[in-house]
A protein has these predicted regions:
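A contiguous, well-structured pocket-lining segment that forms one wall/lid of small-molecule binding clefts
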Residues: 49, 207-286, 295-309, 336, ...
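Conserved phosphate-binding/catalytic loops in two-lobed NTP-binding clefts
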Residues: 130-131, 303-328
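Glycine-rich phosphate-binding loop plus the immediately following alpha-helix
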Residues: 146, 169-211, 236-237, 241-245
């Protein structure tokens, strides 16, 4: 009798895990400039969260250098595994499956994590679970709020993505709205550069804005054809042009007020559209995810206005908004429970679309 292939053996293991309804997931995230390994139980319980950040290195270049990012992922990933196992007080024998981000992101960075995860899964005879990075961000809410269950509406806002999504069930999504051009995080980074704020611009702009008057400068509100869509390109351009015009006139720009006024414009647009989508879909619960979800004004406005609209509002702690592997472990568990596994030919997909699997 011909022996079963790796894929066939893993399907049998995954079936047993699904019947049991429990799984300890080793998760890997390497889509950009953070290498991360986490251990998550049942999609809800964080056992370990090991992260190696590259921010200080890329800050020297004013942004992420893909080749450097890939090399640093290779150097960091094995030590992070040891750290994660130590944090969880467990061994590889206790791991039931491996989840890995396979897109979207930087191709070289993704390949590091995918190749490592495939090798580990094959060597340890463990099921391999492919996870969309953006779905991971949404799933961070499951770890932060063990009582949160679908359906709910989620605003996903990061450096490369801005979406409003209806989460109808675990792993089942409907795209309600999205940016028609730039992502919110990209707009924050570009305006930060104009204000001579060093990398990473978005978080530093947020801190600067806390000290400013958000009514000091007037910026246009972008219009979109889609009822729930965003547009940040025009706003970003208007803000940058206004800064250049003021400087050409010899006028001083108050960086704190400028940052605060810009932040207010972006946050108002994000919150307005998200609450409109929640109202029109009849949602009772609202969540937020992604790096921009760490923005202090966005968090406070979503909570204040969401609760005023009668919604239950959930958001991850800031440490789970930026890239991490805990969120990948959470998403991976529900993919496993749905019977979704990767074959060993799994490849990195840097342009993977929203929740495309």
């Amino acid at each position: 009798m011909k022996p079963l292939s790796y894929e066939a053996r893993m399907r049998e293991k995954a079936d047993a895990l699904r019947k049991r309804g429990h799984a300890r997931i080793l998760a890997v995230e390497s889509s950009c400039d953070e290498t991360a390994i986490a251990i998550v139980d049942d999609g809800r319980i964080e056992r370990a969260n090991a992260i190696a950040s590259q921010i200080d290195v890329h800050a020297l270049y004013g942004g992420v250098v893909p080749e450097i990012a890939s090399r640093m992922h290779v150097e960091a990933i094995d030590p992070l595994l040891e750290l994660a196992l130590s944090q969880a007080n467990c061994s590889l024998e206790d791991i039931d499956a491996i989840a890995v981000t396979y897109g979207p992101g930087l191709v070289g960075a993704l390949l590091t994590g995918v190749s490592w995860a495939k090798s580990m899964a094959y060597a340890r005879e463990l099921p391999l679970i492919p996870v969309n990075h953006i779905e991971g961000h949404v799933s961070a809410n499951y770890v932060a709020h063990p009582d949160l269950e679908p359906p709910f509406v989620c605003l996903v806002a990061s450096g490369g993505h801005s979406h409003i999504v209806s989460v109808d069930h675990y792993g089942q999504y409907r795209l309600i709205g999205q940016t028609t051009d730039d992502a919110a995080g990209e707009a924050f980074d570009k305006v930060a550069r104009v204000l001579s704020i060093p990398y990473p611009g978005g978080p530093l702009l947020d801190k600067l804005a806390d000290e400013g008057d958000d009514r000091a400068y007037k910026f246009p509100r972008p219009h979109t054809e889609g009822r729930y869509d965003f547009s940040f390109s025009g706003l970003k351009t208007a803000v940058i042009n206004q800064a250049h015009n003021l400087r050409q006139q010899g006028l001083e720009i108050d960086a704190k007020d400028f940052a605060a006024s810009f932040r207010r414009s972006v946050v108002d647009l994000l919150v307005d559209k998200t609450l409109l989508a929640a109202r029109d879909t009849g949602a009772k619960k609202l969540t937020v995810a992604g790096g921009v979800a760490a923005n202090s004004l966005l968090r406070s406005e979503l909570m204040r206005r969401g609760e005023k609209a009668g919604l239950q509002v959930f958001m991850p702690p800031k440490r789970l908004c930026t890239d991490n592997a805990v969120m990948i472990g959470a998403a991976g568990f529900y993919r496993l429970m749905a019977g979704e596994l990767a074959e060993l030919r799994l490849n990195a997909l840097p342009s993977l679309r929203m929740f495309e699997n």
